[in-house]
Amino acid sequence: MRTANIFTQITQINTTNDVVSFRNTTGKRVIISFTLKTQYRQFSNVTNNIRPQVLNLKEKGIENRKKLVNSQSLSFFKTTAQAIESQLNSGNLLASSQSIEEIKNISLPVDLNKNVIRFKKRKLLTAYLKQLQIKKLNAVKFTFKLKNRLLNRKTVVVSYTPKVNNTNKVNFLQQLLTFKQKVAKHYAITKISNKNQTMFLNTHGIFRNQKVFKRSKLKMLHQQKVSIKLLQKVLRFQKQRYSILKPHNKFDSILTALMADCNPKKRMKKNSLPIDINHRTEISQQQKDSDLEGLLTKYKVKTQELITKITKKQRRLKYYLILTQLRVQKDLSKGNEVEKKQEIQKKNEQKQQKSIQTQFIKKVLTGVLQKNEQQQETQKALIIKILLNILRRKGEVTGEGNMDITYPYLKEVKKKQRQLQMAYVAANIKMKLVNDFIDYKGDSRLWGIHVNLIKSRNQYLNIIETQFENEENVYQNPIYKTKLVPLRSEVEYLKKTRYMKYGVNSRNKITILNNVMESDKKLYNLRLPKQRVQVPTLLTIYKNVRECLSGTRAQGKKEEDRAIYQFVMKLEKLKRNRNRKQSKLRISKQQEIQPQKEESVKKEKVEQIPLRQGVLRITLKRRNMFLVCQNKSTKHVDTSLTARQEYYRIYNTKDFDAITQKGKKDLKATTVKPKGPIGRFISTEVFRRRVITQALLNLRAQIKYNVLDIEIRNPTSNPLIKTILYKNWYVYKNQGLLRMYKFTKNKAHGSMRQKKARRL
């Protein structure tokens, strides 16, 4: 029977906090702080698509393992998220008025190694951000988290959990399941070949054929299905563009329809979301005009009061500046006073000219308003007629006059029209901000977020007023050439008030879902760099071996230790020859007598390190295990061992002597003979490790071989094969190398057995 510990696997978690900075297309700097939570685990696969791992031949318990993990902590830039939040709240990083969005809890479906994070960390993130096409954000906080994964023979499941309130869980459960089904169908990657060393993912057929071994998981799946059925009943009655966002006014539903008509190119594609977009509200043009006019008339009374206040403030500033200039002039010397009087005279002359122009334009506008009711003509034609009549009275124009004379006057008229038009719109919106600020009903914790949103909107309104003073900025923006200037400004107001109207804590769920879809689609196609392995040098092996033998040193060990040391010192000389730092050898007497040869000199041969390669063949059976270690070059069998032999060696009390086995501390806990038959105990996972380690320690594989290959023969299918080696040996520095694994079978498939039977 299978034990309950089949699916347990040792994991190793590490966390890092880092910062990445880059520039947008506009040239603004973006600063991103993220936290990686890497979860290492060792698992094998039936095929040869397996990565190399480094073995540890020592078993000293969990305490020594913790020391090694802490000693191998990498040197990262460590910055907490609190330090960056303090900078964001102060406003040092924010350079524009765009709203900030937080993308949280994205899962990477790849098993990263420490060496990958060390060398390829920044390149990976910048490439990942470019694929998501994140260009317009100014300060973003990312938190990447690798979640737990269910490991089966053929599939790997990726899980991601965005943070949601209790009220919004029901909407998310539908979105997640519908999204996962699409990814499993369209964006899954099958294994191309067994020969490739790279490892591909299989997500196809997970959700239908998902094996569940625990009752707790079955309950979770049952709750998800129930919540979806409740939603389907609700969504049948909702026929809106976005079934999640519930508009609270007529004005919101109108704008969604107008946005699609104004920007047909930016209309969302089909099947980009799991929600049906084709269900839209049809509104007539008469209804649109009537609704918009009614909304604008509400705020006319409120805006007139604001406009009068603004004009009074502007006048006060002018008087204040004039007084400050006079006070400064008295303090200055007489020479500077004369120069500044001339400058002030020029400015006053310019102001008089502008005042004459403004009075001239006011006459034009008053004439237009009077005649516009009488005559039904275009606004341009009326302005031109009135201009020509005024110019004839002054005598500047004779006869009928040409159109070209009126162009410089028309430009100034258009400026004032637009400035008045946009100031009226900005005052409308500022009144809305006051109402939203007062009527805020939310958590006290989120008050800071609410204030930052209002600041960003006020910045946008200040831009509207200053943007139309220059003519060039007007004609560059083709949006404002249209007649929908007041409408489009309110559309952008709604984009930024959407968080606050629907609740600040409940984010816009469609933007989150689009970001998740684009990210997960491209992670399946993203190829990470290959996993690097540090091959150990012989000096490092010598030091590790010397530490092992220092405590238990006996006869013969000292000579072996010295032989290794002499061999290592030869290799150090060879390295010096390559760098040409070794002192020249003395010339012998025979070489001095011989005549020197020509320039053709023989190059000295360089001694190469011998590659000592070994194989460890394992045959696993249900109640026994065989081990053979062989040298590939000489094909000499060094050791051969079975599991039954060790069982009798350890648990046979007659042969056990405390004097001879004094140093072997591992055997004291296992001297008690276990209950039950022998074969059942040999098939356990703990005993199989002991057989492999004791064979390698008797062989001294660290010294004897540079490289060691493993072949596992598995005539009877056993689920423990895949976890024996990976639980036993972790990735440590410079303690030997396991280069490759092979899983072979003696028996053929059913079709091949029939062919062999025919031949015989």
Swiss-Prot record:
Annotated Basic residues bias: 578-587
Keywords from the UniProt entry: Mitochondrion
Keyword Mitochondrion: yes
Main location: mitochondrion
GO-annotated cellular components: mitochondrion
Organism domain of life: Eukaryota
Chain residue ranges for the region called Disordered: 578-604
Localization per Swiss-Prot or TrEMBL: Mitochondrion
Compositionally biased intervals (Basic and acidic residues): 595-604
Name the record gives this protein: Uncharacterized mitochondrial protein Mp36
Organism: Dictyostelium citrinum
Lineage: Eukaryota, Amoebozoa, Evosea, Eumycetozoa, Dictyostelia
